[in-house]
Amino acid sequence: MNYELLTTENAPVKMWTKGVPVEADARQQLINTAKMPFIFKHIAVMPDVHLGKGSTIGSVIPTKGAIIPAAVGVDIGCGMNALRTALTAEDLPENLAELRQAIEMAVPHGRTTGRCKRDKGAWENPPVNVDAKWAELEAGYQWLTQKYPRFLNTNNYKHLGTLVTGNHFIEICLDESDQVWIMLHSGSRGIGNAIGTYFIDLAQKEMQDQLETLPSRDLAYFMEGTEYFDDYLRAVAWAQLFASLNRDAMMENVVTALQSITQKTVRQPQTLAMEEINCHHNYVQKEQHFGEEIYVTRKGAVSARAGQYGIIPGSMGAKSFIVRGLGNEESFCSCSHGAGRVMSRTKAKKLFSVEDQIRATAHVECRKDAEVIDEIPMAYKDIDAVMAAQSDLVEVIYTLRQVVCVKG
């Protein structure tokens, strides 16, 4: 048995955390969630687990007859894309700052501050490929905004194909044979945040009279068969599609930027399934497990069915992995979505300096300023320990190292 079993008053918690630290607060948050009567079988916990807002990052929450909106959270559909290109390390320019700048020009990124009218993280004039992706989203957007007009006043179309801030990134990586990979991390942007926030608040309002009976107000839920349950699932499915198409558009524009710098064809003539991957790690969907149809919420976890390919990034400056799922049913066929934090962003900014950041990322062309100190590699768990703890969940296909990293 490769997991630790945590017993509770209701469902147990199975934790793939051997050799990695787990905060006491995260354990308590997991115990609180496991107390809910509609948890199916058990909660599965990945080795990158840490305390989260609403629910525990790195948890897989199977439910029957209900969904907890705060467990999905506000970064709906957040996930990863990776593409193995036709390029090798020799094809990259000597001056990697030039490549980083080209990517930054190709993909809007960053947070708008003060009273600046221009949103740095949005398009002024979206390109043609964004228009094509939006066409796939338009019908769902019409339903969403007709039923909930509040979502008209959100960043949506102009956020498609853009990079959010925080731990989201675009990277150029090399594998063991020096083949160039593009890897990126983003989600459903402003519209996904608005959908998540609204339905979390709505669930709490609908359960106002029962909130005191819950272990936490964040565990307010919608019951299957109700109008809000159906609307939430439909809105979340749309946001998850937005997130997937957002990453596709970003990837297309990074490919174009890389092509302009190298003057070489970036995409391989034929790409294998393990060489082009788009996967969510913050989402909910209906799945079959243990012979029953249930809802699975992965909060910072990746689907890892037998033969299914996934992406597990390390911290900025650490290794990342392309993996193949082993279909471990006890984990609800899941694996970690990254390394997982060992300290809060606030603590990291107090503990480390710009000089620490420069030393830790000396081998990567990336930002090395005070605003990204919270992403310093030392703020995250050891990715090798994380991978060892889930050796029965996935097998490593490629190991990647970053050479360029773009942060919002």
Per-segment meaning from a language model:
Residues 2-29, 38-43, 51-57, 61, ...:
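Domain-length cofactor-binding catalytic modules of enzymes
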Residues 34:
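Beta-strand elements of modular eukaryotic interaction domains
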Residues 67, 77-123:
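Active-site-surrounding "flap" and adjacent substrate/cofactor-binding loops of secreted or lumenal enzymes
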Residues 75-76, 186:
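Catalytic palm active-site di-aspartate
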